[in-house]
Structure formats: structure tokens, C-alpha cells
């Protein structure tokens, strides 16, 4: 514990959490156990009195700042003459109340720090997850086409013969138009993707709509093996 004499009526000390534990107090007990908290602060006052001859006379003003490695405490004697005339019992009671108040304030500060830490941790996790998804998306190739109507979607489902099963697909609808997005795995050959795209264009049309636009404004009708779902729910159309 480091003690600094500011003037005749004020002292400042800084004590690390390891110093607190060395004195037989745990960090949790200090902020959550009233009796242990008072015991700790009175022991500090005894040590301050021994080193700096700072005798407790009358009420004290106490200010506490919690840091990552410890706490800084500023203690000042009151200069108010009326308060200086208080009895020892009244002064002790007021000191105890101030100790409890500063403990509560410091505990609240600790809670706020923990909430801030949790918030930053969640933000970092979200950013990490977003980077992972972005990285995963870079390792895939996506094609998007549009169908004029549901009949074209059904015709494609019954006449297509997927060259590969290594893809994920989504069927969107917005403003009465159907959009079909296919995400190919990174190891699928570009030639296979080109063939699949050519097969799609026999029933659908190119589009400048992006996946971001569709996710924001369109409704997902089907996902995961869309063609199989279409064949399950809709009969083949006859020309």
C-alpha cells in the first residue's frame, strides 16, 4: 500500500488487489460483505495513522476510484466546525455510513466496468463471427438468376439435372418475381459452375440483383435443395 500525505487534513493511498489479499481480504468480500468492508477500511485507517499520524477526529470525506489493478482512496478530515463538534459515536456512525456509501459506489463502478467488458467482448465476438462469415463467403461462388413466374421455377425443377450437390440454394420472391441464388463450395470447378449457370439460363434470366438486396427486401420462399422441394409440392406443368 502506498500512502501520500496531501496536506494536514488529506491523505491519499493506493492499494493493489494483491495487497488487499495479502491482508486477508478477498476482492469479492471487500465489495459485497459489509462487515468485512468496514473491517478492511478501519485497518487501513490504523495503518495510515501509524505512518502519517493521521488521527481520525470527527467526520471524514472519502473518495474511492477503482482501477484494474487496485483502488485509490482519498481521505479528508472535515473543516466544518459544527461537524467537528460531533461526538465520537456520531462521528464513527457517520464514517461507517460513508464507508458503506463508497463501497456501494465502487461496487456499482465495478458492475459498470464488468458490463462494459462484457459488451466489448460481445462486440469482438460479433466482429469475429462477421469476419468468419465474410471469409467463408469469399471461398464460395454465387450465381443469381430470376424467374418470371412460378411456372418457370417448376419447369426448371423438373428438367434440371444438377451437376454437383456441393452447393446451397435459396429461392426468394419480391414484387412478384422469383430469384434463385446458388452458393457453390470453394472446391467446385469453375467449369461446373459455368455449366450449372447455362442450365439455369434455359429457364431463367440474368439479374443485377445482389444477395444483399435480396436479404434486405425479398422473402425467402425455400432453402436447401430448392428443386427437390418444388417437385414435392408442385406437379409438373404440361405445355
From Swiss-Prot:
Which is one Pfam family of this protein? MecA
Segments carrying the region annotation (Disordered) are: 118-137
Basic and acidic residues composition bias: residue spans: 118-128
Q: Which GO terms describe its molecular function?
A: protein-macromolecule adaptor activity
- InterPro entries, per this entry? MecA_C_sf, Neg-reg_MecA
Gene3D superfamilies annotated for this entry?
Answer: 3.30.70.1950
State the oligomer form and interacting partners.
Homodimer.
The entry assigns this protein to a family as follows:
Belongs to the MecA family.
Q: What is this protein's function?
A: Enables the recognition and targeting of unfolded and aggregated proteins to the ClpC protease or to other proteins involved in proteolysis.
Quote the record's domain comment.
The N-terminal domain probably binds unfolded/aggregated proteins; the C-terminal domain interacts with ClpC.
HAMAP family on file: MecA
State the protein's name. Adapter protein MecA
Amino acid at each position: 500500500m502506498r500512502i501520500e500525505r496531501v496536506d494536514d487534513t488529506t491523505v491519499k493511498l493506493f492499494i493493489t488487489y494483491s495487497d488487499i489479499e495479502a491482508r486477508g481480504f478477498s476482492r469479492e468480500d471487500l465489495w459485497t460483505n459489509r462487515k468485512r468492508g468496514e473491517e478492511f477500511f478501519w485497518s487501513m485507517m490504523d495503518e495510515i495513522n501509524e505512518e502519517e499520524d493521521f488521527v481520525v477526529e470527527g467526520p471524514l470525506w472519502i473518495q474511492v476510484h477503482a482501477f484494474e489493478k487496485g483502488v485509490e482512496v482519498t481521505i479528508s478530515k472535515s473543516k466544518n466546525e459544527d461537524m467537528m463538534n460531533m461526538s465520537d459515536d456520531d462521528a464513527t456512525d457517520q464514517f461507517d455510513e460513508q464507508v458503506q456509501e463508497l463501497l456501494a459506489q465502487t461496487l456499482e463502478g465495478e458492475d459498470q466496468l464488468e458490463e462494459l467488458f462484457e459488451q466489448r467482448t460481445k462486440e469482438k465476438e460479433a466482429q469475429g463471427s462477421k469476419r468468419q462469415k465474410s471469409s467463408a463467403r469469399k471461398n464460395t461462388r454465387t450465381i443469381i438468376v430470376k424467374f418470371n413466374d412460378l411456372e418457370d421455377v417448376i419447369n426448371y425443377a423438373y428438367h434440371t439435372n444438377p451437376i454437383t450437390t456441393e452447393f446451397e440454394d435459396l429461392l426468394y420472391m419480391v414484387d412478384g418475381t422469383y430469384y434463385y441464388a446458388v452458393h457453390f463450395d470453394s472446391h467446385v470447378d469453375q467449369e461446373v459452375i459455368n455449366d450449372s449457370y447455362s442450365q439455369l439460363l434455359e429457364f431463367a434470366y440474368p439479374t443485377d440483383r445482389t444477395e444483399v438486396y435480396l436479404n434486405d427486401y425479398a422473402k425467402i420462399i425455400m432453402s436447401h435443395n430448392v428443386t427437390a422441394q418444388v417437385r414435392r409440392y408442385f406437379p409438373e406443368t404440361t405445355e
